[in-house]
């Protein structure tokens, strides 16, 4: 039933992930998220090339940076990426990469004063 499907898409996305961030960070958040998108692309190409060391370093940086900006989920994923890279666990790396991609595509910033 296509009308039900169309109706589903018109609803405000229940699949969005709201993240509450202090409004004083509003100027730097778009850049932070753009950098994570770039990390995503870098990690994908590093996985293809087997460059786990770069993934480990990016994961470590995400782990350190995420929480400071209010993105605890990015810190968690960064930690998972770092550990999986150190363990040479490619299937886990693919899973965590998917998790990061999913989070970035669904995150919705809610600025709080």
Go through each PLM region and give its residues.
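Two-component system phosphorelay core
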Residues: 1-113
């Amino acid at each position: 039933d296509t009308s039900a499907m169309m109706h589903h898409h018109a609803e405000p996305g229940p699949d969005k992930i709201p993240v509450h961030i202090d409004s004083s960070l509003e100027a730097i958040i778009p850049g932070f998220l753009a950098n994570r998108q770039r990390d995503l692309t870098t990690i994908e190409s590093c996985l293809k090339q087997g460059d786990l060391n770069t993934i480990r370093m990016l994961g470590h940086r995400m782990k350190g940076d995420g929480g400071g900006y209010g993105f605890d989920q990015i810190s968690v994923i960064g930690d998972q990426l770092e550990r999986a890279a150190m363990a040479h666990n490619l299937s886990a790396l693919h899973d965590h990469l998917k998790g990061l991609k999913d989070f970035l595509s669904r995150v919705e910033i809610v600025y709080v004063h």
